Amino acid sequence: MNTRMKIMLLPLWALLVAAWGACPAQDLLITEFMASNDDGLRDEEGESSDWIEVHNSGLEPVNLDGWYLTDSAANLRRWGFPPAIIAGGEFLVVFASGKDRRDPAGPLHTDFQLDADGEFLALVSPAGEIVHEYSPEYPEQQTDYSYGLGQSVTVFPMVGSQ
């Protein structure tokens, strides 16, 4: 391949690499959260902290290093994940306790708590792009009720069924 051809294909190659790298981002979602936890899930200290569930709906693992959770549209890089892997199909609970714990070997805690009256909540990629959000804010929350995405079910009728 001559030099001119290589130069012409370079932008296409860069575009393909960028698109491939962006694919896992679409697989991460905030699937559920609880902004007023009294009698629900407890953290490692036995406290009923608010929590956020992140789901990797894809097949490939995603390294969370450089990803962020935020409750502020003005500060998209509010709380950064440590270098941790979330496998394809896996769920990860992060406590929104204000304790700011990022040890990948232990439970994760954001440096903010969730507001039961409703607020902005987002998952942000290492590139600073919002991947999933509750915007402009999620609705007022009831104590001990989680909020999030519903589980989708597809029903296919059986051939010959009535």
Give the location of each predicted region.
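Bacterial N-terminal signal peptides
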Residues: 9-19
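A flexible loop/linker signature enriched in serine peptidases of the S9 family
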Residues: 155-162
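N-terminal secretory signal peptides that target proteins for export/translocation
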Residues: 1-6
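Activation on beta-sandwich/Ig-like modules and their edge loops
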Residues: 23-154
